[in-house]
Structures are given as C-alpha cells and as structure tokens.
Amino acid sequence: MTLPRRALLTGLPFLAALALPEPAHATPRGPAVSRASSRPYVSGRGGYAAYRIPALVRTRRGTVLAFAEGRRDGVGDSGDIDVVLRRSTDGGRTWGPLAVVAAGNGNTRGNPAPVLDPRSGDIVLVTCGNAGDVTEAQIMRGEVTAARGRRVYVQRSTDDGRTFTRPRDITDAVKRPGWRWYATGPGHAVALTRGPRSAAGGAPGRLLVPANHSTAPARGSKDTGREARYYAGHALYSDDGGTTWHLGYQATGPAGTVNVNETSATQLPDGRVYFSARDQNGGAPGNRLDSYSSDGGATLDRPYAPQPTLKDVPVVQGSVLQLQGDGAPLLFSGPSVPTARRAMALWSSTDAGRTFTRLATLSDGPAAYSDLVQLGPGTVGVLYETGPYDALEFRRVTGIGGHPPA
C-alpha cells in the first residue's frame, strides 16, 4: 500500500547554528577534534522545552540528517513529544529549519532509528510511541493497555529527508505478546552490505534495527516487572527496504547479571554484526555489554557479556560505528566518567570490538546520549547531549585511522 505523503511541519524559524571560528585541535597521538561546533537543537527554542535522544544518518547525496525528540513539557521521557529533524548540506556546519517528522499530538513519539536503504536510496525511519499520559514505569508494571502502551512505527523519505510518509504501525510484526516496554535504538540503524544475510544474492539490503524490551514476571512472583532484570535485547529487520518487518534475535531474561537496555549496532568488515548495549544496573562489572551475530541479527553468536575495556562509561546509551575503508577502526561514543554523565569521548577498536582504546575527548562538561555518522575517510560527526540537557551539539572529528586531519 502506498502511504500518503505530507510536507514536514516547520517549527518556529531560528538561525542555523554557525560553526565557531577556531581551528581544529590535534593531539600528538590522536585525531583532530574540531573546536568548531554547531548546535542544531537548543532547549527552549523552536517551541520545545527540551531536545533529547539524537540520531544521525547521511543520505546518498551527502546530506546529514539529525533527528531528535522535541519535548514540549520538559526533559522527562513522557508527555507531549515529537520526533523532529534538521538537515545539513555542509557536513554539520550549519542546519536548515526544524521540521516535525512524527507528531505526538499530545502523545509520546521517539526513539528515532534512521537508516539509508542502499537499494533505493530512501531514508527509512523506525520510531516508537505511547499515550502521552503514561510512563515507562506504568508500562513495565503492566498497568497500560496494548493500545496505549508501546507501539512501533516506520516511515520513509524518497527526497533526501525533505518529507516523510506518515508513520505506519508495525507493532504486530515486531512485538511479542507479553512484552511490555519496547524501545528502538535509539540512534542509527544498520543496512547490511556484506555477507550472506545482506540480501538475496549477496546484494546490499537487510535493514537491521537494534532494540530492547521488557517482559512480565512469572505468575506468582512478587516482582512488579519494573525491576531492571526484566529488560532484554532484541532486533527487528526488513529484507525488502522497510515494507515488511520481522523479529530477529531475542535475548532471554530475566537475568539480573546483565540487563540489556538501549542498544546500538554496526556491521564489521567480516560481515558480522556487532551489538553494544547499556547494562541497566546488572550485577556484572562495568556498564557496557556486547555481542555478535553471524546471520544478520537473526540470532546471537553468544549471550551479551560485559565489555571491560569500556569501564569508564556510565549507565547511559552509547553509539557504535564501523568506519568504511581498509583497516578502518570500529568507534564507540559515550561519556567517559563511570559515575556521572559527562566528558563525551570516542573510543577505537582495531580488533572487531574485543578491546577499545580511548581515542579523543570531545568535551569536559555534562554529556549523555550520542550518535555517530561517517562524513568521509577518517572523518565522523558526533551529535550528543550536552549541559544539563541544554542542547544537542555536533562536532566533527578528523584524522581517524591514519588519515590526515582535515
């Protein structure tokens, strides 16, 4: 069925954030972190009290799309929340007007997970939502009907992110009966470009969205379902460019030792998918978990396990991105103080995620959620929450993997 198209709603006009004039700064052993930054989203502007939950994708034409949740009532996770977008045609230096991609209309819409479909060139966007007057805690306790609880939606853009189709509900295909909470990403999804599960005949194709959910306690349990051990990970995928969707791997729970929460994914050069997840107060050391899939996200090669070399990361969402190019590293972004959300940093892995090394620190102040996008050889853009959720800041990092700083 062809969905009707609608023009994106533009928010209140405000000036595109301009890059600061200072030159890039390179450490003797690290990449160049540009002192110039832009802020596509500043809380209190554009009709929203706060912006959170960044997600990035680069279109086939090179346009950077920066998605976020526009929260009208404050920084909280429930209430009147829209999925919003700003576009940049100059690598994140300046940004076009704010647009609403998925309007909450008093309800909650969020957890953007965008991806470039390599076959069509379209941008496919998966999001979640629920009634605006319910909370995550109520949903996890089973106090909310399915209609008012977490739902899953897909949209697409065929015009470089200028307009998107209306959200189409795919919940029945990707959410099992009995699951309560449900969240995609947040952050970019993955288009598989190599390996037997890339698509029929080995062509690029499978769209893979990392996600998490919560389950209900066993009958007779004194638990409410709000306990962190009821979180678990899963993935959803499409092999036809986002038309039909299926459930991939589904991690079992409750465990209590590792509690898989917000998850990011990327495809490694050998074709495997690498998953990196937030450990929501599990009993294992550290706050990051990881796993691998050799069949395009349908199953996991092993259960999630702690990632000890990311021990400085607090309990928070993080982003992973395998850079393209011979010998290019796998990157991870997140705060770098284990007991606080501050000091956004980049880590690098040259052994497919077995170990990570701190690559660069982007800022010393408060920082939380982030997402990564490759802008060119050895160059990435990082969109991250900064301040006490004051803004989403975009920074360019160049000179990664031996490339000269730009």
What are these regions (language model features)?
Residues L9-T10, D90:
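General helical structural elements
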Residues P4, P21-E22, D117, T398:
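Alpha-helix initiation/capping motif
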Residues L18-A32:
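C-terminal region of N-terminal signal peptides and the immediate post-cleavage residues
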Residues T2-L3, A26:
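Intrinsically disordered, low-complexity regions enriched in serine, threonine, proline
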Residues L3-L9:
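N-terminal export leaders
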Residues L12-A17:
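Bacterial N-terminal signal peptides
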Residues G30-A406:
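Asp-box/BNR beta-propeller blade signature and adjacent active/binding-site loops
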